[in-house]
C-alpha cells in the first residue's frame, strides 16, 4: 500500500511526516529528492543552469535556491519553463524510488507537496491531506519564511487552493489546532492502517 501525503504550503506536512517516520514507516520526501537533484552536478542542476544561465549560481558554483525562487515566483514564464524542465526529471526519480521501496515495504508513504497539481493521484492507494484554513496558512507561512503578506500570498497562489484538494483525499488531517491534536490524528490514522477493520 502506497499512501501519498500532501497539503498546502505551510500546512504542517513536515510534522506529519516526522510522526509517521517515528512510527517506523518509510517516507519518500519529494522535496529532498528535488534538493538532491539540484546539487552541483545533479540532473536538475544541469538542466536549470542550461535554461537560466549562471545567474542562478552562487560564487562557489552551487545553486542559489533563494535567487531561483525569486526568479520563478516573480515571473510566470520562468515558472512555466522551470516546471516543464523539472517535472519530468523529478517524476522519473520518484518513480524509481517508489518501485525500489515497493520491493521491501508493504506500506510506505510519499510526501509530495504538489501531488494533485502534477497529477500523481493514480500512484496511490490512499491520499492524506494536511489541511489548514487560508488565514492560518498565510500567518504560518509569513512567520516560517519571514515573508511579507504580498510575497506569502504569491506563494500560496502558485498552488491549487487547499479546498480544491479535499475531494482527492481519502483522509483529511486538520491542522488548525495545536501540535498535540495534530499528532493524535496522525497516530490514530496509523493505528487504523496497522489494524484494518
Swiss-Prot record:
One of the record's GO cellular component terms: cytoplasm
Under Pfam families, the record lists: CoaE (PF01121)
Q: Where does ATP bind?
A: 10-15
Which GO-annotated molecular functions does the record name? ATP binding; dephospho-CoA kinase activity
DPCK domain ranges (all copies): 2-197
Q: Does the keyword Nucleotide-binding apply?
A: yes
* EC nos: 2.7.1.24
**What does UniProt give as the signal peptide span?**
none
The compartments listed are: Cytoplasm
**Pathway, per UniProt?**
Cofactor biosynthesis; coenzyme A biosynthesis; CoA from (R)-pantothenate: step 5/5
According to UniProt, the reaction catalysed is: 3'-dephospho-CoA + ATP = ADP + CoA + H(+)
Keyword annotations of the record: ATP-binding, Coenzyme A biosynthesis, Cytoplasm, Kinase, Nucleotide-binding, Transferase
Q: Name one GO biological process term.
A: coenzyme A biosynthetic process
Q: What class of enzyme is it?
A: transferase
Q: Which family does it belong to?
A: Belongs to the CoaE family.
- Describe its function: Catalyzes the phosphorylation of the 3'-hydroxyl group of dephosphocoenzyme A to form coenzyme A.
**Record's protein name:** Dephospho-CoA kinase
Q: Which organism is it from?
A: Streptococcus pyogenes serotype M3 (strain ATCC BAA-595 / MGAS315)
Amino acid at each position: 500500500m502506497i499512501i501519498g501525503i500532501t497539503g498546502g504550503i505551510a500546512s504542517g506536512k513536515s510534522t506529519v511526516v516526522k510522526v509517521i517516520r517515528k512510527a517506523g514507516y518509510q517516507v519518500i520526501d519529494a522535496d529532498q529528492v528535488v534538493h538532491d537533484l539540484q546539487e552541483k552536478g545533479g540532473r536538475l542542476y544541469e538542466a536549470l543552469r542550461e535554461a537560466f544561465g549562471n545567474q542562478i549560481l552562487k560564487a562557489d558554483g552551487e545553486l542559489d535556491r533563494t535567487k531561483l525562487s525569486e526568479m520563478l515566483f516573480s515571473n510566470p514564464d520562468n515558472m512555466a519553463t522551470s516546471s516543464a524542465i523539472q517535472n519530468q526529471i523529478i517524476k522519473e526519480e520518484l518513480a524509481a524510488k517508489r518501485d525500489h521501496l515497493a520491493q521491501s515495504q508493504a506500506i510506505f508513504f510519499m510526501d509530495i507537496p504538489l501531488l494533485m497539481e502534477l497529477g500523481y493521484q493514480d500512484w496511490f492507494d490512499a491520499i492524506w491531506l494536511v489541511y489548514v484554513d487560508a488565514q492560518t496558512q498565510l500567518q504560518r507561512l509569513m512567520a516560517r519564511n519571514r515573508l511579507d503578506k504580498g510575497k506569502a500570498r504569491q506563494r500560496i497562489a502558485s498552488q491549487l487552493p487547499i479546498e480544491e484538494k479535499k475531494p482527492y483525499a481519502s483522509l483529511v488531517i486538520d491542522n488548525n489546532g495545536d501540535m498535540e491534536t495534530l499528532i493524535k490524528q496522525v497516530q490514530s490514522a496509523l493505528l487504523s492502517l496497522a489494524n484494518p477493520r
